[in-house]
UniProtKB/Swiss-Prot annotation:
Residues 45-55 have a biased composition (Basic and acidic residues). The lineage of its organism: Eukaryota, Metazoa, Ecdysozoa, Arthropoda, Hexapoda. Keywords: Cuticle, Signal. One of its GO terms (molecular function) is structural constituent of chitin-based larval cuticle. It comes from Manduca sexta (Tobacco hawkmoth). This is Pupal cuticle protein 27. InterPro entries: Cuticle_Struct_Prot (IPR050468), Insect_cuticle (IPR000618). Component of the pupal abdominal endocuticle. May have important role in the pharate pupal cuticle structure. Transmembrane segments: none annotated. Pfam families: Chitin_bind_4.
Length: 180
């Protein structure tokens, strides 16, 4: 009896198909309609102009240096135009990379990383809008108040009698209807 169970387990485990080491994405074009998003015609619906070149690209240059102190430098270049390089140490790093986009334009990003965080720079990156004038004025007023010893912690302090800064009045004694 044990022999039959043992042989059955061996037979089942040896017949099981091992998972493939290759990633095969799900069929993205399985719709019933022909065309770029449908399943008829063999198109997956996810094609980019340089996709075939990327599949067959090779590494044409690669460098890697690591020192005992923790400093390092690495870089590589591929046959489809992707380039990357980085140098740094335990506390900070700087580097960059470039690639050719779907539109044929080469995009380059340069970055530093360290105590101040990750700081990328590139012409294709969005830029924050300018700070509105009212916000700049409020920030300057906050700096003046802090220099004068006035700190607003966001809490209500009845001992201030409604005054947030010297000379300001919150309507105390004006008949505003709010009395504490």
């Amino acid at each position: 009896m044990n022999l039959i169970i043992y042989v059955t387990i061996i037979a089942l485990t040896s017949a099981a198909e091992l998972p493939s080491r290759n990633y095969i994405p799900q069929d993205q074009g399985s719709g019933p309609y022909p065309g770029p998003h449908g399943g008829i015609g063999g198109d997956t619906g996810n094609r980019r102009p340089q996709q075939d070149a990327e599949k067959n690209s090779n590494v044409v240059k690669q460098e890697q240096e690591i020192s005992d102190s923790g400093n390092y430098h690495f870089g590589f270049e591929t046959s489809n135009g992707i380039r990357a390089e980085e140098a740094g140490g335990p506390e900070q790093a700087q580097g960059g990379y470039s690639y050719k986009g779907d539109d044929g334009q080469t995009y380059t990003l340069i970055y530093t990383s360290g105590e101040g965080g990750f700081k990328p720079q590139g012409e294709h990156l969005p830029v924050a809008p300018p700070t509105p004038e009212a916000i700049l004025i409020a920030l300057q007023q906050n700096e003046r108040d802090e220099a004068a010893g006035i700190f607003d912690d966001g809490q209500y302090h009845p001992e201030n009698n409604g005054q947030s800064r010297p000379g300001a009045s919150a309507g105390a004694g004006t008949g505003s209807g709010y009395h504490y």
